[in-house]
């Protein structure tokens, strides 16, 4: 009765809310959000540097999140590379001195805070020719003015960056008098034109005063109150912003440190100076402001201009625009023709007359419609991760942000369970379910930033290995049973795997290896195909006649294992193979194939394990050793219970080992050999009991059917900055943002899956002669792409 009510309820929901209506809703949401963000950009401005300098919040205790953009954490080498041959000057009081020390420590962490505090402090890194000076001018007075005035002279070398600020010393010396504030205003008014002149050739920042923690202030600092600090800040902002009459001031207000201090000043030792962690954050913001536009780090979107549109991207935009126009013309013509041939009613009989000609939906219409949809989807991809229309934020890991969503989807998955059509081991519904829940876990892992937590990282590595295990199992089973080594099958698989990634490489201007999982699966598919297709071709039908062929196949697999071991322990040979042109165009990332070597080596044995498992399973199945009936255990009760016990112990043992990992490099070294233990344990736990084999989660299986699209699409329309950050469609409400962006993301992935299937039927025909012609066209397309890519690379250099 409950099952009947569940099915009726599901039909009722599907009647009113289908996948199609969900996609329409997603499209409306995208248009509304794009319009809102465009309006916001026009009203507030498009300069993310202003947001970085003036706004933000803490994610947790020490992670600062600027409004609308991402901050990069600069390493020593990156900082030196950015600041080579540069001169940075800090002018001000003890607070500016603190900022100076924190900034210098990004370049040289060993630099010590020592020497006379009330004197100038020089720093120079000769390896990068970086010069950073602190100039002691605790008051805005004639002394500071003279220092700045010297730099305005044409004959004097000017600092590339000037960071200035002072006020608390004036409040302290003059006991917080109103006369001191008036004098401060006069002095800063006289300095403002000089700063403005310097700002035309250098980056000039005026650091507003941070609040103090009044309860901790010593007696000789009690007159420094937050009320007086606010008055001095207001004076500085008012005067510096009005120093130019007809245009915006070039002197940038560094006010974000105030926000940081408001959250952390309670941790101050004296109530006046910020704790070290806060100073490090402020210094890193300063580094981002100056260096992001120079080095253009992927995860540092603040202060970065929109990347220039390449020639290939322009051609892609033209192609999709023509496809949209072509489809609209085709649709209008087809619609008019349909109206002309509309069934009319016989006046005498009242019956409808049938049309003589019934126009079928042509391949051309499907082709144009698919490219039209794809063009609109690619426009959304570009808006999300290249056009800087939508906001981006840094990830921040907490245990709750990972484990709570995992529990939530687990409950949903258990709720939506149905009976399988067949009860074989790893049947289609079960493998779709497996792919589905693994993909959802991987998505949660990525968006929560859980890679920083090693036990979670190691378990996710097993899930990636399980995908590759399924690749080995699935393709081996197909070739072994069907014996179909035709070019049509190969082209269909390669097209479905690579179509979306090739389009994204063109539209998003990213190398093929950037979407590392697709190259990995593609190469392993070709390895499986070549292994089984090479002479002698051994398939199940042939092996059934003579057991000798089983040994022949095992010999083939043995040679494959030796070849894998050879490449795994010969990095030079591996790099020589994949550095050959044009393979290098596919597998190089940042000018070398190391990343590809690392990714391939990390799961080098698991595809072989999948093939071997498929061979053993199909051999046992053929000899009717397995009981795969509905509700029946896979083996006899004793053997089933024993194997279940071993599987559970093995599964838990691996989890305990992964959870106790302390060093990522060491665990990665062991992973290729031991990951199969947990994979096989899971398969046996899932398939030995008959009742477990007879049901599956339709919720997980639905996601499993679009798992590849979900994995690829997340790079740009769910995450941001090439997976380094999170896409923000709705700022200020993280939960609502995740719900809306996830809804749109899933709808897009599902639509792309359908588009890929439709195009695969048209572009990859079954007729061999037609297919060869199409392959020649595809080869010509890629040759053209290689030529254009080479032209682009030369123009960049």
Curated annotation (Swiss-Prot):
Residues 1-18, 335-363, 417-439, 483-486, 535-547, 627-638, 693-698, 747-770 are cytoplasmic. Highly expressed in peripheral B lymphocytes. The keyword Acyltransferase applies. Changing residue 94 to A: Abolishes O-acetyltransferase activity. It is a multi-pass membrane protein. Its main location: Golgi. Keywords: Acyltransferase, Glycoprotein, Golgi apparatus, Membrane, Transferase, Transmembrane, Transmembrane helix. The keyword Transmembrane applies. InterPro entries: Cas1_AcylTrans_dom, Cyclin-like_sf, NXPE4_C. It is found in: Golgi apparatus membrane. Its EC number is 2.3.1.45. One of its GO terms (molecular function) is N-acetylneuraminate 9-O-acetyltransferase activity. GO terms for biological process: carbohydrate metabolic process. It catalyses: CMP-N-acetyl-beta-neuraminate + acetyl-CoA = CMP-N-acetyl-9-O-acetyl-beta-neuraminate + CoA; a ganglioside GD3 (d18:1(4E)) + acetyl-CoA = a ganglioside Ac-O-7-GD3(d18:1(4E)) + CoA; CMP-N-acetyl-beta-neuraminate + acetyl-CoA = CMP-N-acetyl-7-O-acetyl-beta-neuraminate + CoA. The active site is at 94 (acyl-ester intermediate), 270, 273. Residues 40-313, 385-395, 461, 508-513, 569-605, 660-671, 720-725, 792-797 are lumenal. The chain crosses the membrane at residues 19-39, 314-334, 364-384, 396-416, 440-460, 462-482, 487-507, 514-534, 548-568, 606-626, 639-659, 672-692, 699-719, 726-746, 771-791. Glycans are attached at residues 46, 175, 187. It is an enzyme of class 2 (transferase). One of its GO terms (cellular component) is Golgi membrane. N-glycosylated. Belongs to the PC-esterase family. CASD1 subfamily. Key enzyme in the biosynthesis of O-acetylated (O-Ac) sialoglycans such as gangliosides O-AcGD3 and O-AcGD2, which affect various processes such as cell-cell interactions, host-pathogen recognition. Catalyzes the transfer of an acetyl group from a donor, the acetyl-coenzyme-A molecule (acetyl-CoA), to the C7/8/9 OH-position of a sialic acid residue. This is N-acetylneuraminate (7)9-O-acetyltransferase.
């Amino acid at each position: 009765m409950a099952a009947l009510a569940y099915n009726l309820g599901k039909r009722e929901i599907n009647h009113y809310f289908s996948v199609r209506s969900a996609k329409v809703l997603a499209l409306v949401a995208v248009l509304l959000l794009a319009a809102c963000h465009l309006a916001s950009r026009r009203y507030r401005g498009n300069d993310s540097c202003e947001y970085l300098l003036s706004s933000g919040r803490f994610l947790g205790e020490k992670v600062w999140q600027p409004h609308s953009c991402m901050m990069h954490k600069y390493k020593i080498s990156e900082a030196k590379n950015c600041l080579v041959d540069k001169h940075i000057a800090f002018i001000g009081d003890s607070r500016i001195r603190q900022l100076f020390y924190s900034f210098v420590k990004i370049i040289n962490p060993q630099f010590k805070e020592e020497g006379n505090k009330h004197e100038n402090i020089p720093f120079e890194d000769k390896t990068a020719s970086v010069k950073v000076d602190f100039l002691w001018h605790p008051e805005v007075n004639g002394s500071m003015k003279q220092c700045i005035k010297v730099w305005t002279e044409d004959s004097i070398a000017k600092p590339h960056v000037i960071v200035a600020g002072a006020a608390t010393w004036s409040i302290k010396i003059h006991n917080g008098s109103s006369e001191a504030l008036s004098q401060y205003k006069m002095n800063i008014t006289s300095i403002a034109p000089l700063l403005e002149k310097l700002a035309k050739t250098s980056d000039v920042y005026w650091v507003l005063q941070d609040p103090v923690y009044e309860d901790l202030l010593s007696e000789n600092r009690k007159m420094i109150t937050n009320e007086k600090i606010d008055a001095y800040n207001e004076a500085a902002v008012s005067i510096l912003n009005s120093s130019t009459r007809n245009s915006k001031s070039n002197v940038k207000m560094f006010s974000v440190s105030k926000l940081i201090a408001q959250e952390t000043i309670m941790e101050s030792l004296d109530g006046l100076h910020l704790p070290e962690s806060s100073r490090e954050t402020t210094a890193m913001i300063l580094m981002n402001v100056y260096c992001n536009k120079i080095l253009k780090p992927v995860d540092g979107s603040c202060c970065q201009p929109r990347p220039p549109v390449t020639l290939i991207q322009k051609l892609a935009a033209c192609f999709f625009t023509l496809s949209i126009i072509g489809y609209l013309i085709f649709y209008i013509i087809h619609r008019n023709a349909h109206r002309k041939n509309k069934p009319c009613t016989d006046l005498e009989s009242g019956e409808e007359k049938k049309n003589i000609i019934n126009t079928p939906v042509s391949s051309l219409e499907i082709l144009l419609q698919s490219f039209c949809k794809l063009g609109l989807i690619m426009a959304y991809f570009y808006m999300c991760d290249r056009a800087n229309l939508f906001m981006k934020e840094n990830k921040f890991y907490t245990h709750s942000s990972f484990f709570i969503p995992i529990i939530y989807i687990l409950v949903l998955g258990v709720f939506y369970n149905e009976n399988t059509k067949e009860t074989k081991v790893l049947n289609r519904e079960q493998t779709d379910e497996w792919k589905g829940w693994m993909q959802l876990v991987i998505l949660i892992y990525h968006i929560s930033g859980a890679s920083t937590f090693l036990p979670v990282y190691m378990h996710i590595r097993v899930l990636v290995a399980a995908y590759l295990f399924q690749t080995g199992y699935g393709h081996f089973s197909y070739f072994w049973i069907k014996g179909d080594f035709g070019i049509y099958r190969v082209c269909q698989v390669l097209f479905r795997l690579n179509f979306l990634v090739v389009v994204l490489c063109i539209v998003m201007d990213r190398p093929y290896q950037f979407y590392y999982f697709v190259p990995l699966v593609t190469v392993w598919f070709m390895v499986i195909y070549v292994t089984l297709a090479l002479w002698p071709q051994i398939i199940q039908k042939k092996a059934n006649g003579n057991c000798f062929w089983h040994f022949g196949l095992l010999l083939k697999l043995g040679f494959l294992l030796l070849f894998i071991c050879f490449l795994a322990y010969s990095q030079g040979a591996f790099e020589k193979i994949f550095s050959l042109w044009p393979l290098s165009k596919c597998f190089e990332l940042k000018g070398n194939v190391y990343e590809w070597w690392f990714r391939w080596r990390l799961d080098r044995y698991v595809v072989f394990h999948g093939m071997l498992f498929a061979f053993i399973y199909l051999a046992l199945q053929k000899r009717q050793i397995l009981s795969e009936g509905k509700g029946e255990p896979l083996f006899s009760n004793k053997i089933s219970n024993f194997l279940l016990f071993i599987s559970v112990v093995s599964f838990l043992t691996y989890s305990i080992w992964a959870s106790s990992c302390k060093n990522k490099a060491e665990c990665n070294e062991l992973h290729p050999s031991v990951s199969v233990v947990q994979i096989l344990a899971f398969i046996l736990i899932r398939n030995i009991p008959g009742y477990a084999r007879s049901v599956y989660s339709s919720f997980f299986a639905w996601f499993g059917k679009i798992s590849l699209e979900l994995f690829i699409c997340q790079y740009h329309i769910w995450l941001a900055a090439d997976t380094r950050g999170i896409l923000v469609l709705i700022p200020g409400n993280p939960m609502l943002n995740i719900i809306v962006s996830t809804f749109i993301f899933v709808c897009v992935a599902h639509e792309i899956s359908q588009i890929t299937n439709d195009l695969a039927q048209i572009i990859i025909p079954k007729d061999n002669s037609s297919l060869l012609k199409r392959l020649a066209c595809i080869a010509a397309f890629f040759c053209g792409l290689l030529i254009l890519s080479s032209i682009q690379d030369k123009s960049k250099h």
